[in-house]
Amino acid sequence: MKLIKAILSDILIFYERIISYCYWNFKGVRITFLCQVSRKAKIESGCLFTGNSIITENASVGSFTYGHNVNINNATIGEYCSLAPDVKIGLDEHPLDKESTHPHFYKKIIQKKSIISNHVWIGANAIILCDVIVGSHSVIAAGAVVTKNVDEKTIVGGIPSRVINTIRNN
């Protein structure tokens, strides 16, 4: 019986991917078949997501933003953002003052959103935690862990991230 339930579950996941793939590509958002993109997410046309990208129902993405193998949850992302491979934005938090950090031991936490403004470039393997605002035209270096807000036209990197430089327009 457990095997049958597991097979049925896999079949349902497969059909959900087909429906999601058709839904988003029809709306002008290009996703590849392996992506898991909620139909409740808000994604503008012109976006491209490839690989095993995951975009949850709590996400909002502006037009012409793209990414490969990205994980977007509890986040609002602006237009024309470049997300390098394996970027993670707005991951869930767990309480540290409970018996356990496992979700069975506490009530659901209301997650705070991350906000990524327009024209932001986020390097490979960067992580942007919940409740962080990244200003427009900023750059997040590869592998950075962003725990605090980033001003516009700022380059940050490191763990935790710190300001590396500012961007000056010519």
Label the predicted regions.
Residues 140, 158:
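Conserved G/P- and acidic residue-centered "switch" motifs that form tight phosphate/ATP-binding loops
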Residues 48-132, 160, 167-168:
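Flexible, glycine/small-residue-enriched loop-and-beta-strand segment within the central core
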Residues 124-138, 144-147:
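Beta-rich strand-turn-strand
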Residues 39, 45, 53-55, 154:
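Soluble, non-transmembrane catalytic domains of enzymes that act on hydrophobic metabolites at membranes
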Residues 38-40, 59, 150:
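Short, T/G/N/S-enriched strand-turn elements that build extracellular solenoid repeat scaffolds
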Residues 97, 148, 152-154, 162:
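Glycine-centered loop/turn positions within well-structured domains
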